[in-house]
Each structure stands twice: as structure tokens, then as C-alpha cells.
Amino acid sequence: MDTRSEVLLRQAELFQGSLLLAGLAADDLLGRLPNARGWSWHAGDQAALEARFPGRSHFGVDAPAQSFDSAVLFLPKSKDLTDYLLNALASRLAGRELYLVGEKRSGVESAAKQLNPFGKPRKLDSARHCQLWQVTVANAPEPLTLQSLAQEYELPLAEGPLKVISLPGVFSHGRLDRGTALLLEHLDHLPAGHLLDFGCGAGVLGATVKRRYPDSRVTLLDVDAFAAASSRLTLAANGLEAEVLTGDGIDAAPMGLNGILTNPPFHTGVHTDYQATENLLRKAAKHLQKGGELRVVANSFLRYQPLIEEHLGPCAIKAEGQGFRIYRAKRG
């Protein structure tokens, strides 16, 4: 069981009423708290929760419509996302209890200060390298719209400026990261047909490809509901139409693709996690048509080339710079 869930269960008597668990782990906590419901924005966690506890976890960027008497936020990595989520919960909990739980190394003690606008927070427990904080919501805020927290910036591209709409919690929020910047310079000669932006984030790659190759069918895929929402906003801001999916890794992608483009993620919260990328490299051939191409940008120190060659075919380094490499391979 997740250590944060273990800390909650040390205080289980506090959590017997109607409770919302926001950002919960995909463990047995719902089984131990029969009156609790979940709210997840991670497609993999949501699928696991739905399989074990059907109908008890809500997925998306907005809090569930059902009422709740108290709520626990599992601290996310992003401070901006924490602000949005605490606001969404506190706005529904006037005079009631809001809890924050997180690992010490994720900065939960500092994040507890974000409870100050709502009342007087206090630390309830410290165990398993985690802390549990509580505040009685004396000052319930007006709910913020997610779009009011969006950051917009423009990328000067050959086809004209591209507007990017980035939401809290999305990778490289409010700015272009170096890996994607390098890949944007090397989108020439993509195969015609159906192209996938894997781990789409705010939709920079997918939107750029759709504008440059308007006759191609473009799909954008991410595990995170906030990323999918960002991608939809980016596409709309540029008058583009493409399919946006949420799903847990390459297994959620369509079959019969002509190309896969990715600046793949390697963090889950504060933890380094290469599983989604390695799974993509192992299974890309299954999702690509014969002659279909995989184009990956990654940190130069990551040894992806042997993995690509083992599972897909000969792999070339198309470009490198700023500590990144672009790998290119085709399915034979």
C-alpha cells in the first residue's frame, strides 16, 4: 500500500464519513474506507481503481459533482496544480475538514502553507516519511476556473506563430522544454497517414504536426487529464482539429499508425520512472504499420538506441544538441 494511504489509515476514525480522496494512489484505500470516493486525473490509476472499485472513482480535471463532508488531497508535484486542487476542494467545504497528505521529500511541509488562506492548518501525523495536515475551512474561496490558471505562450514557427495553452500540472508548464524544441526542428519528411503524439503534454508536437501536415490524421495521447485538456485548448486556439485521448501508455494508442513522435515522460510525481517509455519502445512495432516510423527525443545519457534496435529495427541518431538526441527508426 502507498505510504500516504498508510498514514491516513493511522487516523482512520477521522475518515468514516462521506469523504473525497483527490489524487489517491491505485491501492486498497477505497476498500478500507467504505464511505470514501476517489478523484483521479491519472488514467492508469483510474483504470486500476475502476477495476477494483467500480463506480467509486471519478476521472477528470473537475471535482466530482457529488457532495462530500471532507476531502483529502494527495499532494501532487506541481505547486500550481496544488493551488487549483485545494481551491476546488475548499470551495465545497465551508466549515468542514480539508486534509493534505504527502511525502516529506515532495515538500509537503512547505505545501501545507497553501492551506493558510482557508483557516489555521495543523499537522496531525508524521510517519512513513510522510505528513498529514488538516484545516477546518473557515474561509471558503470562490471556485477558480481551470482556464483562469492557464498560461499562454507563442512559438515562432516557420508556418507562423503557434499558440500554446498550458494548464497547471502539465509538463514544462508555461514554457517550451529543450527536448521538444529540438524535435520541432526535425519534423521533416514525416510519413503520410496517421501520426501519434505520445505523451502530448500541452499539445505542442501534435498541433505543430497537424498544421504542417494538414492531410494527416493526428492523435494526441497522454496519461494525464490535465495534459489532455491543455492539448484540446492548444488545438482550439490554433483552429486545428485532432483526436485527443487519455490512456495509460502505448497500450491505449490506436493500431495501424504511420508515425509515432514523442518526447517521452520519465517522472511519476517526484519519482523517476522509465517504464512508460521503455514499454513504448518495446511495443511501438505492434502499433506501427510496415514502414511506419518512430521518432523519439530523449536525454543523451538514456540508452534507448539498443532497446529500439532490439524491438523495432535499425535506429539512427537524426540530431543532437543541448544534451538531447533524436532517435529515428522504421518498422521493417
From Swiss-Prot:
Q: Superkingdom of the source?
A: Bacteria
Give its E.C. classification number: 2.1.1.172
> Which GO molecular function terms does the record list?
16S rRNA (guanine(1207)-N(2))-methyltransferase activity
- Kindly give the InterPro entries that the UniProt entry links to this protein: Mtase_sm_N, rRNA_ssu_MeTfrase_C, RsmC/RlmG, SAM-dependent_MTases_sf, Small_mtfrase_dom
PANTHER family, per the entry: RIBOSOMAL RNA SMALL SUBUNIT METHYLTRANSFERASE C
Subunit comment: Monomer.
Protein name (record): Ribosomal RNA small subunit methyltransferase C
